[in-house]
């Protein structure tokens, strides 16, 4: 049961459900369940939602250090590049474009970009593990796109299984390096990322281009929520650095 009466919160630029959940001591799932008409991937500035805080409402004006802003910028850019180059690869496969190999090579540079954001805080061994797992995620996803394009259902099913197993491994790895990275929460976000990406791939390959674009917009919002989750975990684990 909620401890306090609900407040009415007005969505501001930059708000995400994860950020609001952290700010008010609740969860993303509870925010969604409390606001059934809410689209979690398309928060509108000025939109009003109900929030049941689990502690006294904090000030909406809170201070963020320069170091935290820098971390957030680097984390956001790394994950946005992740989905952007994945989309470029999808478009190249779907359209049999000549830039496929060059696009794939650029896509596979992204795991190091993401790993380097974590390297500063966790060292080379953990950063290299993150890089390996994200590389596997991209390679499996790339092979899956090709299998779906070629209507190879048997191979696609095998790759789907490997893709989700890789997500489980990532959730396990992240949960071990930071107590603020709940394995269940990381797994939930990664599974949602795979679901939305699968939706994007299906729409693109079937020529549903408007739906394809909407899928990508959902992925953008979801990946920024995930990026913010990782940033907040680092800030809480290493408060002296921020």
PLM regions and their residue ranges:
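Mid-length scaffold segments of soluble, non-membrane domains
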Residues: 124-158, 163
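C-terminal amphipathic alpha-helix
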Residues: 68-93, 104-107, 111, 148, ...
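Short, charged/polar, low-complexity loop and linker segments
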Residues: 59-64, 117-118, 172-175
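Primarily a LysM-type cell-wall glycan-binding module
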Residues: 1-25, 47, 55-56
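A glycine-rich, hydrophobic loop/mini-helix early in the fold
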Residues: 106-124, 132-134
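Short acidic beta-strand-loop surface patches of small beta-rich interaction domains
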Residues: 32-39
């Amino acid at each position: 049961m909620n401890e306090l009466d609900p407040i009415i919160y007005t969505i501001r630029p930059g708000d995400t459900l994860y950020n609001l959940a952290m700010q008010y001591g609740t969860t993303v799932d509870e925010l969604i369940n409390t606001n059934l008409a809410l689209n979690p991937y398309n928060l509108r500035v000025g939109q009003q939602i109900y929030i049941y805080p689990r502690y006294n409402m904090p000030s909406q004006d809170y201070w963020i250090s320069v170091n935290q802003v820098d971390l957030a910028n680097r984390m956001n850019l790394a994950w946005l590049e992740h989905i952007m180059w994945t989309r470029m690869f999808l478009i190249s496969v779907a359209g049999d474009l000549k830039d496929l190999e060059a696009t794939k090579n650029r896509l596979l540079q992204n795991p190091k970009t993401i790993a380097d954001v974590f390297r500063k805080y966790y060292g080379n061994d953990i950063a290299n593990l993150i890089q390996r797992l994200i590389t596997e995620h991209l390679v499996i996803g790339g092979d899956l796109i090709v299998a779906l394009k070629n209507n190879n259902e048997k191979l696609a099913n095998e790759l789907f299984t490997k893709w989700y197993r890789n997500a489980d491994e990532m959730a396990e790895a992240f949960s071990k390096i930071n107590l603020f990275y709940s394995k269940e929460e990381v797994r939930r976000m990664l599974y949602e990322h795979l679901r939305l990406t699968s939706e994007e791939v299906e729409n693109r390959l079937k020529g549903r281009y408007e739906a394809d674009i909407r899928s990508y917009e959902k992925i953008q919002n979801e990946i920024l929520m995930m990026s913010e989750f990782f940033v907040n975990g680092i800030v809480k684990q290493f408060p002296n650095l921020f």
